[in-house]
């Protein structure tokens, strides 16, 4: 097998549900080293031996890759810094306006960006199958996406529902 240099990760929104899951996954994979954790407020405790910081150039300097699962406002803070430092970024944040989506496309001309409303294999397979079904059925069928969430869901429709809607 190939020997790879470890990927130095910066994880934004480290106290959020997805941030916590990414930390857990990255710690269990020897190919990753978490070098930076950020949050939108001062945090006075260490997480996996790292004191979270705010989104600053200094915070992201050691990272090869930034993983962002936050909110649109924060994502653009991070994108601005990532662009300046020429850092790769994975964006799992959802809820962007059309104008914001276009701005992300502009940033993608300067730095590598991987963006998806849902990163799971199952949902991406469902997306692919939805596109096939939609093409097969044609315009003679009306398709709708319905979703139900817990009361704390921050964005609705969800990024997943929007992805499926585009596939239809």
Listing of model-derived features with the role each one plays in the protein:
Residues 66-67:
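N-terminal Rossmann-like NAD(P) cofactor-binding module of classical short-chain dehydrogenase/reductase
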Residues 76-80, 84-85, 92-115, 124-133:
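Rossmann-fold NAD(P)-binding glycine/threonine-rich loop
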